[in-house]
Amino acid sequence: MAEQTEKAFLKQPKVFLASKKTGKGKRPGKGGNRFWKSIGLGFKTPREAIDGTYIDKKCPFTGTVSIRGRILAGTCHSAKMNRTIIVRRNYLHFIKKYQRYEKRHSNIPAHVSPCFRVKEGDHVIIGQCRPLSKTVRFNVLKVIPAGSSGGVKKAFTAI
């Protein structure tokens, strides 16, 4: 079923492993030996979440976490932690006295499911969920690799 690397036996809580049936269901739910769900909001469930063998109770697709609240976009600033990334959001703040803007940023820690491969510089879309730890309140829903810009042209290009 899954890579057993912990002392406790890893299993999904909604799947009965001793079933005599061998049918693999392709509908969201408990068909087969893997539970997965569609989170809605226009986000597709990744193929790795459906066919993969990882166990992650904090994954929005295969775990017990529901996405509600804010949906934010940002850039992966750090991917050094285990299953957690830091998402950097840049914005402009207006200074009334000088009638100018200054650059500011905010760092948001987000849980990343093993079904995603996230590197520094990738654009990610994160969704708010219940508190997963002391600081983590968001979950990665979609990853856009750094090389693909998604059809957006650069403003200034050399001819």
Swiss-Prot record:
Matching InterPro entries: NA-bd_OB-fold (IPR012340), Ribosomal_uS17 (IPR000266), Ribosomal_uS17_arc/euk (IPR028333), Ribosomal_uS17_CS (IPR019979), Ribosomal_uS17_N (IPR032440)
Record keywords, A-Z: Ribonucleoprotein, Ribosomal protein, RNA-binding, rRNA-binding
PROSITE patterns: RIBOSOMAL_S17
Disulfide bridge partners, by residue number: none
GO molecular function annotation: rRNA binding; structural constituent of ribosome
Keyword hit for Methyltransferase: no
Entry's family note: Belongs to the universal ribosomal protein uS17 family.
PANTHER family noted in UniProt: 40S RIBOSOMAL PROTEIN S11 FAMILY MEMBER, SMALL RIBOSOMAL SUBUNIT PROTEIN US17X-RELATED
Name this polypeptide is given: Small ribosomal subunit protein uS17
Originating species: Euphorbia esula
UniProt gene name: RPS11
